[in-house]
Amino acid sequence: MPRSLKKGPYIDIKLERRVLDMNSRGEKKVLKTWCRSSMISPDFVGHTIAVHNGKTHVPVYVSDNMVGHKLGEFAPTRTYRGHAGGKAEKGGAAPKRK
């Protein structure tokens, strides 16, 4: 369920302040953040934000298409290693018996 429109988007105050400060100075550094729930505002476009996924910080370059989404959507927290495929690794299934 989306957030109410009368409340407005949730943007981490410290993160927004750092981005606005970098915009005024014209810098482009990687910003580390643990705030996955923060919404991406148009001020973030062009910056690289390292979003924590529970283990490491994943660098996310913010483009125009990402505005309105949350930072956590672009830093997956789970790694998929595939299903147990013992037969597939050995070269196929066992031959059928008649």
Swiss-Prot record:
The keyword NAD does not apply. GO terms for cellular component: cytoplasm; small ribosomal subunit. This is Small ribosomal subunit protein uS19. Residues 77-98 are annotated as: Disordered. It comes from Chlorobium phaeovibrioides (strain DSM 265 / 1930) (Prosthecochloris vibrioformis (strain DSM 265)). Belongs to the universal ribosomal protein uS19 family. The lineage of its organism: Bacteria, Pseudomonadati, Chlorobiota, Chlorobiia, Chlorobiales. It holds the Pfam family Ribosomal_S19. Protein S19 forms a complex with S13 that binds strongly to the 16S ribosomal RNA.
